[in-house]
Amino acid sequence: MSQLPLASQATTTDLVSTTAMQPQSEGIVDESLQPQHPPSSTAHDSPCLQDSVPLVPPPPSPYLNKEVGQMVCGSCRILLAYFRGAGYVHCTCCQTMNYVLEAHEVGKVHCGHCATLLMYPFGAPAVKCSLCLFVTEIGERNVRRRLSIEQPTRTNSSGLAEA
């Protein structure tokens, strides 16, 4: 088996230069040096499939157009900012994981001593003011009513209550 001259041997592993390289000696023809996939005559006649596919914009980033909420850390009382919809907020000062309450889970009452507006989770019996440390009892007027009590009962024409 004859060897190719050094000038015709590939010195790089580039696929394009390897397939396009032709031997310099006239009598040697190597089939492995030919292009692997010649262009098809039907490839130019068929329409491009990408043109027929409707382009859909990528979904927005989960952090764009998000509302930012604020809460006070339950341990060190520092103000924390978080994206709305988060279940927990991590305080970087004291490493506490704070549970985030939604608006419908929070009650509001004024402090019985300094009249500061206080927020508390529904069901709490009392709230301690962070300014004057006074404990305000959550009375019956501040307890969230049940849904069945909030909805008035309707009566039909025969005098029976409807659900």
Swiss-Prot record:
Superkingdom of source: Eukaryota
Compartments it resides in: Nucleus
Region described as Putative zinc finger 1: 70-100
Segments for region (Disordered): 1-51
Cellular component terms (Gene Ontology): nucleus
Keyword Transferase in record: no
GO terms for biological process, alphabetical: defense response; positive regulation of defense response; positive regulation of growth
Disulfide bond sites: none
Main subcellular localisation: nucleus
This protein's UniProt keywords: Nucleus, Plant defense
InterPro entries: LSD1-like (IPR040319), Znf_LSD1 (IPR005735)
Compositionally biased intervals (Polar residues): 1-25, 33-44
Region named Putative zinc finger 2: 108-138
Annotated function: Involved in plant growth and disease resistance.
Note: Plants silencing LOL2 display a dwarf phenotype, decreased content of gibberellin GA1, reduced expression of KS1 involved in gibberellin biosynthesis and reduced resistance to bacterial blight. Plants overexpressing LOL2 show constitutive expression of PR1 and enhanced resistance to bacterial blight.
Name recorded for this polypeptide: Protein LOL5
Lineage: Eukaryota, Viridiplantae, Streptophyta, Embryophyta, Tracheophyta
